[in-house]
């Protein structure tokens, strides 16, 4: 009887410790990202995705890292994955609008902007910067 209780207790402790370590991947990766240690944080965000594949935050931070590394294809892939998991993620929508403006894909920018205006809560002032970028692009084309 004591042996069964001991085994159950040890097993429970291992499960608790394991679930804590999974959660700490994201937290630790975010701390490293804030310190601009992108390679180390990228590795931890990728590990977090292995344990939590439906966590949009890890994909968003990976997209930000790939933006710093100027890897447009990976940045876009991670932003789209973020939006698949969390369609109302305003930061991902905003970053994707930036990419589409650079590509001059104004139909996509318009679609994203409409969606952004519906869901924005923290980044609403960024709409004016998107409008300004669009206006600047139109001015360049007229010249």
Language model region names:
Residues 61, 95, 129-133:
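Canonical tetratricopeptide repeat
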Residues 34-35, 68-69, 102, 119, ...:
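Register position in tetratricopeptide repeats
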């Amino acid at each position: 009887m004591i042996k069964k209780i001991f085994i159950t207790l040890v097993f429970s402790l291992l499960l608790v410790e394991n679930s804590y370590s999974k959660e700490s991947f994201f937290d630790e990766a975010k701390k490293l990202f804030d310190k601009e240690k992108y390679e180390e944080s990228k590795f931890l965000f990728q590990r977090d995705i292995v344990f939590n594949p439906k966590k949009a935050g890890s994909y968003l931070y990976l997209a930000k890292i790939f933006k710093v590394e100027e890897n447009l294809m990976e940045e876009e892939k991670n932003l789209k994955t973020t939006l698949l998991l969390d369609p109302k993620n305003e930061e991902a929508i905003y970053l994707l609008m930036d990419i589409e403006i650079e590509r001059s894909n104004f139909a996509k920018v318009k679609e994203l902007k409409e969606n952004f205006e519906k869901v924005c809560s923290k980044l609403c002032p960024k709409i004016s910067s998107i409008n300004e970028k669009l206006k600047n692009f139109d001015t360049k084309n007229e010249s």
